[in-house]
């Protein structure tokens, strides 16, 4: 895309510094927010921000949500340019569902440990070991992996997707081992093979921390993302009577927001990336939301800084490209998921 020469705040843009950890040098203050909104209008662009983004990025966005919901919004909005504040696979998914639109990500180096835990070559080799198996991939995967997938799923509909597959068919579930274990536990399916991938942030929220927080806040509700390694611990605590079963909820990010709007609890413990707390507090300002692990911050999500956003809008970078043939195959796996049932609260 073209640079918006002469139409931006040069003094602000000149502060942007690139370094190993990403772009810095600009604060997400009111002047920055005004400039972002002005540049979005000049570019005819809409800004989509994931739930795990920095609060100032979420607050300036046109839409905030999970990756699949945002990608579907990208396909529906009238703007021809989409700025996706998230990690790279999310921007890829937006491009897959909106191939005719220009998709920008403020820093293309913002990767994902979960998406990177399986490659297309590894998936093809796994498929060769299980001929005839149905491949179910979490939407948190690259375009190349989606292109090798039969049906995509989100954390909110993974059980429904797997249950739709004939019981005598083997299922290869990738890449998240904890979501896969959750699906196997709920469906009781013995022919479900699970890839040993994980999100480094969710895997780092451990059962001991969860148990300590539950004991310290016995009247709280507990929202646990199924990518968490501690999801099994949460169910164990409930089963042992250490925590009331009706207060333990295994939820996608969208499911957490729905539950927050309806909860009668005064306090909620949240086991997911800490950026989610911003949206939860906006949804239910009278509830005390606390992170089970306040260090559970995704360094890749946080690479989308105010400086990165400003540089993106000034320079029209970084543009996301997906090979058309790969995108067409990947799009089919997402469409099959939608045909089975609405993806609901996404990842």
UniProtKB/Swiss-Prot annotation:
Enzyme Commission number(s): 2.5.1.72
Protein name: Quinolinate synthase
Positions bound to [4Fe-4S] cluster: 112, 199, 298
Record's keyword annotation contains Endoplasmic reticulum: no
Cofactor binding, per record: Binds 1 [4Fe-4S] cluster per subunit.
Name of the gene: nadA
Lineage: Bacteria, Bacillati, Actinomycetota, Actinomycetes, Mycobacteriales
Keyword RNA-binding: no
GO CC terms of this entry: cytosol
Family: Belongs to the quinolinate synthase family. Type 2 subfamily.
Binding site for iminosuccinate: 50, 67, 138-140, 155, 225-227, 253
HAMAP family: NadA_type2 (MF_00568)
EC class: transferase
